[in-house]
Amino acid sequence: YGGGLKKDFEKAPEINKKTALNFANLLEMIARSKPKIRIRFSTSNPQDMTIDVIKVMSKYPNICKSIHLPVQSGSDRILKKMNRLHTREEYFNLIDKIRKIIPECSISYDMITGFPTETEDDHNLTLSLIDYVKYDFGYMFTYSERPGTLAAKKMEDNISLKVKKRR
């Protein structure tokens, strides 16, 4: 779940395709075979959190009803600049599915403020997303350049530290 076969599944040998497990199947196998252990996994990117995983989580009492779902921004414009693979609407739809299938599920997030070119309107979209989701807790960070990333190479860090901290 993440790298490896997932990225090149169509190019994989047929035997690999036939024997491959997706994360939902693996999670269910472990939950069923080890009912006395408590299972928790962390940080699933929104585009990787499937309805099948959510259903498996709801089915087994030994799987913690907690999902860390990094969103980074509530603005589609900023998400695109960050090269994130989800949109605001897709994130809302995912949250709605989680709340419907596992009403008691705890949801946490990661958020970055002050990404290059972020406007007050972009920031307000992020605040409205936070209000909608009603997270249990989250991790907030101010943007800082990471060497080697596209943002560091191509974008000017044009948001002042004062504004980043206020947001």
Regions found by a protein language model. Name each.
Residues Y1-E120:
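Conserved SAM/AdoMet-binding glycine-rich loop
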